[in-house]
Amino acid sequence: TVARKITLEWILAHVIEDRDKLEPWVYDLLLLSLYQLAYLDKIPAHAVVNDAVAIAKNRGNKKGAEKLVNAVLRKLSSQPLPDPSQIKRVNKRYSVQYSLPVWLVKKLINQYGEDRALAIFQSLFVRNKASVRVTDASRLKEIAETTGADRSVLSPVGLVKSSGYFAGTDYFKEGLLTIQDETSQL
C-alpha cells in the first residue's frame, strides 16, 4: 500500500470531499481497501467491501463510519477508477502514475531526461526475482530441480526464481538455503 500511496490518495480524492473530516483509521481503511480493489485481482470487490464494512462496524464508535466506508467502496468498485494518464501536467501525471513525490519526478527528469526518468519510474514496479544461497553446494542440483529454480549466473552456489517462496520449503527449514541477493553472494 505504501508503494502506491500517492496514487491511492489521488483516486480517493475523487470520492472524498474533505479528507480532514475523516478519522485517520477510516481513511487508512479506505486506502487499504482501495489497494485491494485496484491491485489485487484474486479478491472479489464484494468481499473487499464486506470486510471493510465489518472492520468499520467493529472499530467505529459512530454509525456513520460503516455507512461511509460502504458508500465510498461501492462507488469505487462499481465504476472504472480515475485514470491518471489524463492529468495534463507531466510532473503531476508521473507523480500520480508512479506514486512518487512531484519534487522527485522533477529532479529525475531534469537530471536524466524524460525517457530515462520514465524507465526509472517503471522499474520501481518490476517484481524482483527471489534468490537464495545454497549452504551445501553438493546438493545444489537436487535443490534446483525440486524447487523449480534456476542456477544463478552470478554465484556458483546461488539459485533464482522469477516468482515463488523459498522460505516455505523444507530446504530452508533445514538450513540448506539462506535468503540472499545474488550480488551479496559474490
Where are these regions (language model features)?
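Accessory substrate-recognition/RNA-binding modules or partner subunits associated with SAM-dependent
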Residues: 2-97
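Glycine-rich nucleotide cofactor-binding entry segment
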Residues: 79-186
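Conserved AdoMet
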Residues: 1-40, 133-134, 153-167, 171-185
